[in-house]
């Protein structure tokens, strides 16, 4: 069994473009009903919005089976620890034997951004050139990286309650992607005027509902990476098409207290990719997606990392 640390995973050299492409394949399989993925069970240690989730999935077309064991602890930033952490176990779908254990911090960051890009391909205007980012952390970075694969991005409008985080973010995005980054002083400035809006703060059971109705432009698209945490219900109701990556799992979240004031779901991402449900149809419609982050995302990426690591001699082989 091959163990891959976070640095090993990164060293395989997998690109965001490859991840976006593989996720689209996986969601097409899901849209055909060819993916096995039960709603993720979880535990919630401590108080507030802490979670530890088990996320299993089997994608026959990609010969991928396994599970991610992932945690999210919002207070970890104060401890100078990652908000998201965990491990991924990849199994051989023919024998059931585990073939790899790998750190999942980088995988989670990259596949979440990639899912936004796949959603935006079907729900955003294809000439979208500006992105408003609220929350200049890991997901604020990976979502811009992924959107830059699919869209002719020119400008990022960045807001974060921590000004130092916003300044560091602006420099990094400019240096890495050559994009013009404007830091703004309030959330509305990052929403109004942006072709694409990404909210990427902590996931909260009770939304702080900062983004109000009327802020989002006609024709814009929003990716709610932090669920509905940032959004007032009236702002959500302005959506022409409110989508998600998995309707069944969204219903599960509603049962445990999340998403209490959202519009009816138009489609999940598999239905958009397969054409079962319509994506964007006019330049004027406002579209949104609340992608939950699925085991499918991780299990689409994990085999690519594993096979590349084996080919390149990366990682540590563990003996029984």
Q: Where are these predicted regions, by residue range?
A:
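N-terminal ligand-binding/catalytic initiation module
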Residues: 1-109, 117, 127, 296-299, ...
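Glycine-rich Rossmann-fold phosphate-binding loop(s) that bind the pyrophosphate
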Residues: 135-137
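Short glycine-/small-residue-rich Rossmann-like dinucleotide-binding loops
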Residues: 201-203, 226-227, 247
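Short helix-loop-beta connector
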Residues: 123-130, 152, 217-218
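Adenosine-phosphate binding glycine-rich loop
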Residues: 8-13, 229-320
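Short acidic low-complexity segments
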Residues: 177-194, 211
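NAD(P)-binding Rossmann-fold cofactor-contacting core
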Residues: 149-176
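Rossmann-fold NAD(P) dinucleotide-binding segment
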Residues: 193, 204-221
